[in-house]
Amino acid sequence: MAFRQALQLAACGLAGGSAAVLFSAVAVGKPRAGGDAEPRPAEPPAWAGGARPGPGVWDPNWDRREPLSLINVRKRNVESGEEELASKLDHYKAKATRHIFLIRHSQYHVDGSLEKDRTLTPLGREQAELTGLRLASLGLKFNKIVHSSMTRAIETTDIISRHLPGVCKVSTDLLREGAPIEPDPPVSHWKPEAVQYYEDGARIEAAFRNYIHRADARQEEDSYEIFICHANVIRYIVCRALQFPPEGWLRLSLNNGSITHLVIRPNGRVALRTLGDTGFMPPDKITRS
């Protein structure tokens, strides 16, 4: 009898957990009445993974590349013991530092009826030239340029890449602009439909997981990688990389053509060197839209 009651309790617990996951998934992008000041609890989307660490607690395995997490300890040979474990840990341990340069596209024509019509303005082309010159002046050996497949990002990339000859370019849909997660606090001037958070959020999170992580264990030298994309994507990535609440992304502001520099150490520690730097541009060339 006691065993049957235990099974019933366990079943209730599982059902409750499923309901909680379902609720959190539905809560993303849920329309609300009221103005900017309306309080609400922040609900992480279901695709964001498990429970977050407590405030101020750093998750060392945030990218799921902590060496110990890559080893199946249950398959460890009992006879070889700690020696074999140490060897495997060394095999999976990162050695290099990754430098991630996140570039926001330059100013573009916002009134284009189609995405392909939203090309860079003359000022936007000047901004891209200035950003390219700034990157070239750093004297770094850039490994690659990954860019969004949207027109304004492609045009920004084409101009910047002229200042970085020989650096390969890769286009991806993952970095396209979108609504990553419902912002907190909410704002009245920007309210996408719930389905947009559902579709864009998972894609932008996939971009973060695909591109933002510690170096592969086989990488011997530090790398310098450029990602040319959009304000929402960059702000979300910065919050996720620093393990700040991702729903706070809209509290940050980025100028067109700005440079954000993230550093990912071999031990998984992340540092933000610069956020939205446009100090290399004359004041009359700086815009945010």
Swiss-Prot record:
Biased composition (Low complexity): 45-56
Membrane-spanning residues: 7-29
SS bond partners: none
GO CC, alphabetical: mitochondrial inner membrane; mitochondrial outer membrane; mitochondrion
Site positions per UniProt: Cleavage: 24-25
A GO MF term: protein serine/threonine phosphatase activity
Modified residues (Phosphoserine): 80, 87
SMART domains: PGAM (SM00855)
Keyword Acetylation: yes
Post-translational modification: Both isoform 1 and isoform 2 are phosphorylated by the RIPK1/RIPK3 complex under necrotic conditions. This phosphorylation increases PGAM5 phosphatase activity. Proteolytically cleaved by PARL in response to loss of mitochondrial membrane potential.
Reported effect, residue 24 to F: Abolishes cleavage by PARL
Catalytic activity, reaction form: O-phospho-L-seryl-[protein] + H2O = L-seryl-[protein] + phosphate; O-phospho-L-threonyl-[protein] + H2O = L-threonyl-[protein] + phosphate
Function: Mitochondrial serine/threonine phosphatase that dephosphorylates various substrates and thus plays a role in different biological processes including cellular senescence or mitophagy. Modulates cellular senescence by regulating mitochondrial dynamics. Mechanistically, participates in mitochondrial fission through dephosphorylating DNM1L/DRP1. Additionally, dephosphorylates MFN2 in a stress-sensitive manner and consequently protects it from ubiquitination and degradation to promote mitochondrial network formation.
Name this protein carries in UniProt: Serine/threonine-protein phosphatase PGAM5, mitochondrial
Gene: PGAM5
